[in-house]
Amino acid sequence: ELLLTVPNLPNENVPLGKSSEDNVVEVQRGEIPQLQESAKPHWDICAEYDIVDFELGNKITGAGFPVYKRKGAKLQRALINFFLDEAEANGFTEVQPPLMVNENSAMATGQLPDKEGQMYSIPLDGYYMIPTAEVPVTNIFRDTIQKEKDLPLQYCAYSQCFRREAGSYGKDVRGLNRLHQFDKVEIVCIDTPEHSYEQLEKMKNHVAGLLEKLELPYRILRLCGGDMSFTSAITYDFEVWSAAQQRWLEVSSVSNFETYQSNRMKLRYKNSEGKTVLAHTLNGSALALPRIVAALL
């Protein structure tokens, strides 16, 4: 049990640092638009055109659970289909996973015990609402031995994601900036240690391609050790520019976990020498919808 509380070791290419201020901007693409002073933030546009109703969601459930209406709902559906179609075109197999997982699954991908207080739980049944499709999709391969010739395994999934986001407040969480329930398309890859970093680059290129097709200015950051997740060996964040808010919004994280998750979930493959070894797991958001919609509006 003590070993489950030990985080992953950072890759040698991870910058030293304690916070987001120490992250390294690797690339920035797209022209930053200049709006007039009368430009409205997305939450005002949503209210004016009645396409996302935050007050109604607050009435039904609480803050952070918006109701998408009319063209807002259609835009959500269109973006989800676009992201899934692009993933399939790039070799990812679509699956539709459960939105709840058991404790073993959450332990296997490292959400537990690290994110215990951040996940919505259903104690009566011993289930957790998923914070990302990474959890159920990666667990498809828990307790399996794959054949090397079948690697890489590439999967994509659309799901709603649920996060408590305890302690979040202020203008940075207004509107669609930070929600408790949101839509996201996730890409997951299982590969050999020899090829996993090639896959990482392909996944980064896939995410960049989506943002370029949406014509959104974006930048890629290599996260420092202090800003990475508990489970990651290396992570790249993608941020888009919100012209109305005049700031960058994170819309994707692409990570290589190396053998951290596979060791917890006993995900192995038989190599060319006949030896059974741990695989590398990778995943990325491709993409998370709320902030994409915020930037588009």
Which residues make up each language-model segment?
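N-terminal alpha-helical targeting/anchoring segments
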Residues: 1-33, 47, 51, 55
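TRNA-recognition modules of translation machinery and tRNA-sensing kinases, especially anticodon-binding
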Residues: 28-297
